Amino acid sequence: MLFRSHGNGASFRLLEQCGADSINPVRDLSLDMLCALRASVSVPLDVHTDCPEGSGGFIRTYEAPEIVRCCAPVYLKIGNSALAAHGSLPTEADAARMAQQAAIVMEMLERYLPEARQLARGEGRGLVAEAEVRV
């Protein structure tokens, strides 16, 4: 497993051609950048909705519906802001805060993008090639 983020369409295409089944964009890309990257590949994207303070400390809860709209199929990575640093093991209290953050993101999705649904494992493959991607 490779833990490295990428931020341009050429590297996304290369990763897909090399067999990547999902791609993790750089954490702090704008929505416009994420939409453009989505247009370059058909594999799901792994997009962080938040990150630990030691890695920038951003929280994109209110952007989650728009991330899903422009990046689907997408795996939202939720709850990292509860951790002290990237890669640290969560405590029981951290896990509770991570679950709370996930519930808040789900609430935002239900409120602002109710038509979104969670796909079954593997169901997202090939969807992008068939869908219209609006940037």
Which residue ranges define each predicted feature?
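Generic hydrophobic/aromatic pocket-lining and core-packing "Φ" positions
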Residues: 9-12, 34
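A conserved mid-domain beta-alpha-beta active-site/ligand-binding segment of alpha/beta enzyme cores
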Residues: 47, 58, 69-98
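Conserved, mostly hydrophobic/aromatic
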Residues: 15
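Alpha-helix-loop-beta-strand connector modules within alpha/beta enzyme cores
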Residues: 34-52, 100-108
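Active-site-adjacent beta->alpha loops and helix N-cap segments on the catalytic face
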Residues: 27-42, 56-59, 91-95
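C-terminal extensions of enzymes
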Residues: 88-135
